[in-house]
């Protein structure tokens, strides 16, 4: 990061500087001992201000580095609509504009011209009404300087004190700028990268816990992606409690900004209830008996109301007052209206305390002690006859701890279709009442949802004693002027008494008729439900049947396709086999032809060898002159097997043998050549005519 401010190329002198106000300390974060900032001087005061004007790109260099929400200089520099567009990473909240205009009472952000800042602009001291901030000039960067803000980015992690223009006098985050010396919360907004804001807003006890949408985790104003400095308006308004919690805070679980925002939806509670419900959604044939203690200590039934107290009573005095009757807890006193709610350990002790203290005098006032309304008891109706105490307990235990759960029966032990569930906490009863009214909660396979209503249980067995009446009232005296009596027949009293009886009898008749009608409608709905269930099951079976038919058709098509593929494969294999056999046959024929050709060549070679051998032997015979050659028989045998007749050469020669006659031919003779010395073959004879005929004429 750059540690020094940008220098303007045209700047000839140093810009005006802010001075420290009087002897007032620079750090107004009361109760906080913050480390010295990087731009602070040795005595705790702010260092000299860097030059305010940067280069041509000084306004936009800090778009992604300013994690304090756009305006880090406090009230000095007002962020313009286009100078800092760090909309996605606004982790600190837009507090600079608010400190600029909303804290005029405490004078936290005003600068005073002096020796060190002779060129201070006078419009920084003018007070303006709360509302939208004025647009900043384009030549004044909203972040005081791009390089200066980058240098102070890491220094903002611990304190987020506004250095530079604000001179550490306005610690913005935390409780916001309260305008006075108690401007706390600077230790929150751990700025820069994390900016978790956990320790911030400690004055309010609430902070941005990191659940706001859009990375707004600091204790600033109007967190979330809606915190955009487009119009230079502080979207959180003048709330000093740490901001409104962000526009998207309503969708967060728990949520809650600093002093605003509020909690998110009850998604977490509903989620855990749903998870517990899934664990018991199976069959409930065998349920273990529920062992509930006879009486729970400090239960909702033991809550007493004590009225007509003095406004100076304390919890210790109440404990001392109820000490003879037992231990008390959960005391809630409203001294403005002079009443108190408290819980006694056990119900008998609560009854004793009520009887003893009700009507007693304390400091000239008559105390009134009553059992407080118990909002933890619910009446569950529209139950089927197969719901037991154990099933009722297990079913409603998902909403919270239960002290008692029982089914209401008549004097014969018959199921009355309703029950009572008493929770240990009011929040559990409220969650049960809300979810059962919003949704349909079934306990068995029947589609009759249970109906849940608050049940008013009157544990007051004392009734209304005579001392509770104000006997000075005229109505009391008029009513008590005549005592008990029976009316005489056909008298005025008897006539109007009979009318009252008829009215109540009519009510009972209509009530009974309504109950019978309700019973008939319930039976009718039950029959419709069973028929609809049967139709639904039948429709499911039809759908399953159609699905199976579709699957059957698909499988049939697949089988036919496989058969077709197998037939095609068989045909291809047959064709391949036939082609292979044809190739084998042709190959065998070629081999046979080659063998015959080789045999012929072999015979021809042997004939040539034999011819050459005969030629050699003819050369051994000798005789004759010129080119005549004779063929003598072997071993001087007169019966020579061969006789060669040579062609019409110039010099005819005949085979010479012992018994051979000249120019005589054998009856069996075979002529191998031609009688022409100039045609074909290796012809013997005159060498002048060529040697193309292998033999002239031979006789075997």
Curated annotation (Swiss-Prot):
Sorted alphabetically, the Gene Ontology cellular component annotations on this record are: catalytic step 2 spliceosome; nucleus; precatalytic spliceosome
Identify the domain of life: Eukaryota
Annotated coiled-coil positions are 505-616
**Where is the stretch described as Disordered?**
1-270, 568-591, 677-700
Q: Which Gene3D superfamilies did the record assign?
A: 3.30.70.330, 6.10.250.1170
Q: Which Pfam families match?
A: NOPS, RRM_1
Looking up InterPro entries in the UniProt record yields: NOPS (IPR012975), Nucleotide-bd_a/b_plait_sf (IPR012677), RBD_domain_sf (IPR035979), RRM_dom (IPR000504)
Q: Per its database record, what is this protein's job?
A: Required for normal vision and courtship behavior in Drosophila.
Kindly provide the name given to this protein in its UniProt entry: Protein no-on-transient A
Species of provenance: Drosophila melanogaster (Fruit fly)
